[in-house]
Amino acid sequence: MMLQAFQNRNHKLMKKNFSAGKLPSKGKSAVNFHRTFKPKLKPKTLSLDETKVVLFNKPFDVLTQFTDEQGRATLKDFISIPNVYAAGRLDRDSEGLLILTNNGELQHRLADPKFKTEKTYWVQVEGIPEETDLAQLRKGVELKDGVTKSAKVRLISEPNLWERNPPIRERKNIPTSWLEIKISEGRNRQVRRMTAHIGFPTLRLVRVSMGLLSINGLENGSFRLLSLDEIKALFQTVKL
């Protein structure tokens, strides 16, 4: 009777485990065979001729995505080329160069910090930093997500840019100044956090270049496609 009860109980347990997708393996506890292994997909690499690269001079207050449930301005309002996606981020409240492509591997190499694509920003800050302040940024500053890598930083005269809409909010009794900051990292809102860390909040941020590509000659809100020769040079730069 005891043996029969044990067999019945064991049978019920196996039936329960089978229904749940679990079978015991030798010497180990039950394993769940319903779990599927999802291999990490490699970014899609296209040939030179198949690749499209778009340079876009992003206006202020535009999201770097093509849809938005809240009805805010997106890339769809400016770019009519299908199946291209942004290489890296550019915050809604930032302006300037955004690169888009249909080549997944190119997108990955432009955005991933390990490929060290240098990005140049013109940054209007509140106040006038001294050389000792800039030296902190060059060396690296401690942010919540770690110490930043060394940056190239210098004071510049006010650049000849388009008017921002809406204009920045300036305090009349506090002067502003412009910095040129070059970094190869891509942390969230990194430049803004860097300038705030040394006591000079960012008022306006414009990305002017990524690697060899820049917004020179590109009006704010407009885009252009790279030529085949330009794409070839870009492939060589990122070692594709």
From Swiss-Prot:
Source organism, top-level taxon: Bacteria
GO biological process: pseudouridine synthesis; rRNA processing
Matches recorded under Gene3D superfamilies: Alpha-L RNA-binding motif, Pseudouridine synthase I, catalytic domain, N-terminal subdomain
Keyword tags: Isomerase, rRNA processing
Active site: 91
Entry keyword annotation includes rRNA processing: yes
CDD domains on file: PseudoU_synth_RluE
Catalysed conversion reaction: uridine(2457) in 23S rRNA = pseudouridine(2457) in 23S rRNA
Cited InterPro entries: PsdUridine_s_RsuA/RluB/E/F_cat, PsdUridine_synth_cat_dom_sf, PsdUridine_synth_RsuA/RluA, PsdUridine_synth_RsuA/RluB/E/F, PsdUridine_synth_RsuA/RluB_CS, RsuA_PseudoU_synthase, TruA/RsuA/RluB/E/F_N
UniProt KW Isomerase keyword: yes
Gene Ontology molecular function: any one: 23S rRNA pseudouridine(2457) synthase activity
EC number(s) from the headed UniProt entry: 5.4.99.20
EC top class, as a word: isomerase
Function: Responsible for synthesis of pseudouridine from uracil-2457 in 23S ribosomal RNA.
Protein name listed in UniProt: Ribosomal large subunit pseudouridine synthase E
Species this protein is from: Haemophilus influenzae (strain ATCC 51907 / DSM 11121 / KW20 / Rd)
Gene from which this protein is expressed: rluE
